[in-house]
């Protein structure tokens, strides 16, 4: 089991933590990461885009003029795709973009993402966040003590009110619970900050 330093919210070293190597120190599986991130990004799409074909555009039931004798081109509807205000040909329609991924692959991708941060020394273990105030300015000073000045993802098990309010006004900080943290979120940050409870959660779920 690899050992990792644990600090408090003041940036002081308080202990070391034995991390399970089968969760935090595996060789990242690139295909699993690709499949899961592709599925998670697809799930972000609403899929509500829609256009109207000639069948759904209002009007156009009557033939605009007789077939022969006018000298004009023949038409059967003013809602033909050839006309201004007519229907759209092969336009987008509502659809579900979700992609199924097996749980085994999802867990492998999550372990790969955690291990990637561990191996690149971009993982920060904090015992807990107990903030006295909900001010973002004060929380920013706390992050500076942890040497966090760029894009960061903070994963906790249960978020308290002060932590939620203090972090949401910082554009480079994302707060997420361990149960809802995604592989895409983890790989899309420079600094991964985990509380000890979050570490215990991942080691239990991904064992």
Curated annotation (Swiss-Prot):
Region (Disordered): 56-77
Family annotation (InterPro entries): Ribosomal_uL4 (IPR002136), Ribosomal_uL4-like (IPR013005), Ribosomal_uL4_dom_sf (IPR023574)
Keyword Kinase: no
GO terms of molecular function: rRNA binding; structural constituent of ribosome
Transmembrane segments: none
GO-annotated cellular components: ribonucleoprotein complex; ribosome
Chain intervals with Basic residues compositional bias: 63-77
Keyword annotations of the record: Ribonucleoprotein, Ribosomal protein, RNA-binding, rRNA-binding
GO terms (BP aspect): translation
Complex and partners: Part of the 50S ribosomal subunit.
Stated role: One of the primary rRNA binding proteins, this protein initially binds near the 5'-end of the 23S rRNA. It is important during the early stages of 50S assembly. It makes multiple contacts with different domains of the 23S rRNA in the assembled 50S subunit and ribosome.
Family: Belongs to the universal ribosomal protein uL4 family.
Name of the featured protein: Large ribosomal subunit protein uL4
Source organism of this protein record: Phytoplasma australiense
Gene (UniProt): rplD
